[in-house]
Regions:
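Generic secondary-structure boundary/loop-capping signal
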Residues: 85, 90, 182-184, 188, ...
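Charged, amphipathic alpha-helical interaction segments
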Residues: 76-80, 199, 218-219
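Active-site rim/loop-helix segments in enzyme catalytic domains that contact anionic ligands
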Residues: 1-111
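Metal-dependent de-N-acetylase/amidase catalytic core
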Residues: 1-14, 97-215
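Single conserved hydrophobic/aromatic residue that forms the stacking wall/gate
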Residues: 214-223
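Generic hydrophobic alpha-helical membrane-span motif
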Residues: 25-28, 140, 222
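Conserved residues at the C-terminal ends of beta-strands
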Residues: 47, 86-89, 118, 175, ...
Length: 223
């Protein structure tokens, strides 16, 4: 929607992802640009990230703690307003009514103009990102939370008891690839910040992976 047609300029965004580092792999430069331009950007993570390790000495509780710390450091680099950890167990996420309610609560609390989230459909051409069940569940629950749950007063009326009035999100952006995309963000000048944010996830990302990403990511990023 053109700025001239909006009741108020867009200035608040919410990014809803399954795991710590999902946003950094998909839309970190967009988040960095928004923050630099004065937007309030909140990141909501659905899972605790407690399964992403091949270290036989690592425990789920310890990994969850490490990844939460890494995400907070990344958020500082990007300039995010807040990070919300919903804390669902990693790798077991399903688009339940409870997850939808928990996401809708944050939508009502932070009242974003734009929500950025994951695609709810499986991409069989993607070996990792597009086929992870937590990503699919997050996309489905986030879309349902935006519409109709966060919008409708009589859905989960207990949220009203928490002082959270309904909220209508202006736009939803789905991260993805070139095919079928209809919205592009020029992130020229923000890739270095995005790479530094990705490097904060030391338990998940090797320096070689960050270097490779730096060389191959385009400067116009799809959101």
């Amino acid at each position: 929607m053109p700025d001239s047609e909006r009741e108020e300029p867009y200035s608040r965004a919410m990014v809803i992802m399954a795991h710590a580092d999902d946003a950094e792999w998909t839309c970190a430069a967009t988040m960095a640009k928004m923050c630099a331009e004065g937007w309030e950007v909140v990141l909501v993570l659905c899972t605790d990230g407690s399964k992403g390790s091949d270290d036989p000495e690592m425990t789920a509780d310890r990994l969850a703690e490490i990844r939460a710390g890494e995400q907070q450091e990344s958020a500082r680099i990007l300039g995010l307003k807040d990070v919300v950890f919903l804390g669902y167990p990693d790798s077991y996420l399903e688009p339940t009514l409870q997850l939808r309610k928990d996401i809708a609560r944050e939508v009502r609390r932070h009242r974003p103009h734009v929500v950025i989230t994951e695609p709810p459909t499986r991409d069989i051409d993607s070996r990792y990102y597009g086929s992870h069940p937590d990503h699919l569940a997050t996309g489905e629950a986030a879309l349902a939370a935006v519409f109709p749950t966060a919008r409708d007063r009589l859905t989960f009326p207990e949220l009203l008891d928490e002082g959270l009035e309904p909220h209508k999100v202006g736009e939803v952006w789905i991260v993805g690839g070139l095919e079928g995309s209809d919205h592009f963000i020029d992130v020229d000048g923000y890739m270095e910040t995005a790479m530094e944010a990705l490097k904060a996830h030391r338990s998940q990302v090797s320096p070689e992976a960050v270097s490779y990403t730096h060389l191959t990511l385009p400067t116009k990023r799809i959101v």
